[in-house]
Amino acid sequence: MVEVRNVSKQYGGKVVLEETSVTIQKGKITSFIGPNGAGKSTLLSIMSRLIKKDSGEIYIDGQEIGACDSKELAKKMSILKQANQINIRLTIKDLVSFGRFPYSQGRLTEEDWVHINQALSYMKLEDIQDKYLDQLSGGQCQRAFIAMVIAQDTDYIFLDEPLNNLDMKHSVEIMKLLKRLVEELGKTIVIVIHDINFASVYSDYIVALKNGRIVKEGPPEEMIETSVLEEIYDMTIPIQTIDNQRIGVYFS
């Protein structure tokens, strides 16, 4: 379980997060939704210790993350940022192997290769694993980075807009894969996502942010409501039920 208690963050005097508290339950997919600038990515980065908080506390499995050893934390928590830049020429397989660094320190074992090959298989990258990243489409590159996170084999996986650059087919495949990681392997996944319909269909719990505050949280059946979404997005979004899934018709 991850507990965020009264976390605040400012940049240059501008409040990005204000007295934010939320609990992430284990073994579930939790989605952060909200308009641009709401604080979603900042909250995720603070939870993963990529950004320092100004105040507040964050606990992972009962331990304050500031007190966690970095090497041990990397075995428990992995994160994929919104923008990923690597300045050396790597193949997909090379990149995915980086996910094992917390365990191998660069000296890969047979067990490491099991995780690497499993991640490549999950992401359907075996046939192109020897291609260089600069030879890939945006979607293929995104899938390679997600495979690296999977290879890290952590209890907690934090993903900042992982559907960027993906077409509909691969977006659905990614979300189904994340669901499998939760249901089959017991992973806990937190995802920043813009499409409320992906959040509705695949999340166990949704947290909505606006202007640096959590304005609403709950299961999809409570969150994907016209009145709730209007408070979050300042627009009226009709809701339809299709195959027992609540879908927001926001493009009409």
From Swiss-Prot:
Q: Where in the cell is it found?
A: Cell membrane
Catalytic activity line of the entry: a Fe(III)-siderophore(out) + ATP + H2O = a Fe(III)-siderophore(in) + ADP + phosphate + H(+)
GO CC annotation terms, alphabetical:
plasma membrane
- Chain residues that bind ATP: G34, P35, N36, G37, A38, G39, K40, S41
This enzyme's EC code(s): 7.2.2.-
Q: Which family does it belong to?
A: Belongs to the ABC transporter superfamily.
Q: What is this protein called?
A: Petrobactin import ATP-binding protein YclP
Native source species: Bacillus subtilis (strain 168)
